[in-house]
Regions:
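Conserved acetyl-CoA-binding loop of GNAT-fold acetyltransferases
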Residues: 141-154
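Conserved N-terminal entry element of GNAT/NAT acetyltransferase domains
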Residues: 1-28, 171
């Protein structure tokens, strides 16, 4: 009995101080996508790009997964299935106030599990390549590596005029 009370007490304390894991669910929320991206200007400083991601969040071609904490969307991901065997992580972003809590990893793990269960074998993601020195994107590349992605190739003029690194993760 003591261990059950202790565990229950720990959960209540975690909830009280806001460290409970977020709920991960499939939901479209273009407004939350815009809000989160606008709060991340080091990655999403182009208003046109934010408009495009907001439209993608409303587009049924993309699967939208969100992380919700206390009723607020604090993380978003958009995935597009190109073929039965492969999909692209089109967007992942976490509210800066919620960074460092494992929310990005939880979103990717959820997306990967859903895709794997549906027969998908490979997940790709595009980010700014290492030949363009930029500290925020160096953090992005490190995050993708830490969540199981491996660099495949770098191209110029793919998603923007500079270098794009394509990373892949086996599911």
């Amino acid at each position: 009995m003591t261990s059950q009370r202790s565990t229950s007490g720990q959960r209540h304390e975690q909830a009280r101080i806001g460290i409970m894991p977020p709920e991960i669910l499939q939901k479209r929320d273009p407004v939350a996508v815009r809000r989160i991206l606008e709060s991340l200007p080091d990655w999403f400083g182009d208003p046109g790009a934010i408009d495009n991601y907001e439209m993608a969040a409303a587009d049924i071609e993309f699967v939208s997964i969100v992380a919700v904490d206390s009723g607020n969307v604090i993380g978003v991901s958009l995935t597009r299935r190109h073929f039965r065997e492969s999909a692209e992580l089109h967007l992942i972003a976490v509210d800066p106030m919620a960074r460092g809590r494992g929310i990005g990893r939880a979103l990717i793990d959820h997306v990967a599990a859903d895709l794997r269960n549906d027969g998908c074998m490979l997940l790709s993601v595009h980010t700014v390549g290492p030949s363009f020195e930029n500290e925020p994107y160096a953090h992005s590349r490190a995050f993708y590596r830490a969540t199981g992605f491996h660099p495949l190739e770098e191209h110029n003029n793919l998603d923007w005029a500079g270098p794009i690194l394509i990373l892949v993760r086996k599911l």
